[in-house]
Amino acid sequence: MYRSYSLLILFSLFNCLSAESQFTATDWPNWRGLTSDGQAKLVDGLPTEWSQTKNVVWKTFIPGRGHSTPTLVGNHIYLATADEDEMFQSVVCLNKLDGKMIWQTKVHEGQFAVGLNKHASHAGTTVVHDGERLYVNFVIGSQAYASALGLDGKLIWQKPIGKYKVHQGYGSSPMVFGNIVVVKADTKIGGAICGLDKKTGREIWRQERPKFPNYTTPVVIESAGKQQMVFCGCELITSLDPLTGAKLWEVSGSTQECVSTLVTDGTHIFVSGGWPKNHTAAIVADGSGRVAWKNSARVYVPSMLIRDDFLYVTMDAGFAICWNAKTGEEQWKERLGGAFYTSPVMVGNRIYGSNLSGKTFVFEANPNEFKLIAANQLGNEVYASPIVSGDRLYLRVAFKGDERKEFLYAIGKN
């Protein structure tokens, strides 16, 4: 039994490393990118300025509505979307080179969940690519589901995660580790986090969760000499073994509702949430529960970025701020304007962050001073976070008017 369990762990770790090796530095296979921290490799030629006509390689109409961030692997882009008139949720696949749609697969049809916040959508999670399959989470009616699709768009399996009562919406994306896809659905009627077999959807492990709504996506970090899957929310910061679901440690220290995904410097994890209280903190990632520092800044929806011992944040209320990651000391704070429901991306020493009204700010990751490089307007509503691949930036934006329409733009020098 022990030998079989050990072989399972070794095999899963091998497959995890093999899957990562399938991707290149220009791939963006899951929420927050290849390294799950919102950072991309700097490539010469990535624009800092654009408009509806300037530096637009292509734009493509995206049917329906969604906050799903683009997923990009090789020459293909994947998005989740929801048609609120026809009542179906789907995944679309586009050609990266010209933006043309290759396929669209209906994943769910039927009565949508009720009670969404006006800033939420019925396609709020990001598609995950593991090199062989696609994984996506949706809530339909009163049930949360995880689904797997082939790269040709054909549905492979579908698994109910559990009953789901909408409070704000649903935004926890799948996470892949080894042979397991992890899915989470925190809800005020009692949720769960599960490890499913990637090939079949069979449940391998399950942990019941507190009766609180929460929207975070787990990430795997290496700390204290082990791989830990860490996430916050439900008034807890939790670390699980991603292969077995075993609880490594869990401490109080978060607020109930968190949307942002935590980041780490290897020894600390940086968490934030925004309801019913604002909470941002640096926690020592050893299970001790020791808080290195904390403050009451509202970083509810946007996720943080970390570079060279400094944290960079686009706050919900429209400020950019830089903190010393070791001490929490504020380096600078600057008003950008508008509200932010997206997470910024970092490319080298540049940060790209889009506000709700469609303006994307480009500024330096510089702890000594705030320096704005450019501010670019595209569309008039943005909920999906930008991604970067090579010398192109991809923006999912909406134009509101008599008829609201969404588009995906490929921004590159032309």
Where in this protein do the model-derived segments appear?
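Positively charged n-region of N-terminal signal peptides that target proteins for export
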Residues: M1-S4
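Bacterial N-terminal signal peptides
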Residues: S6-C16
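Noncatalytic, solvent-exposed loop/strand surfaces
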Residues: A19-N414
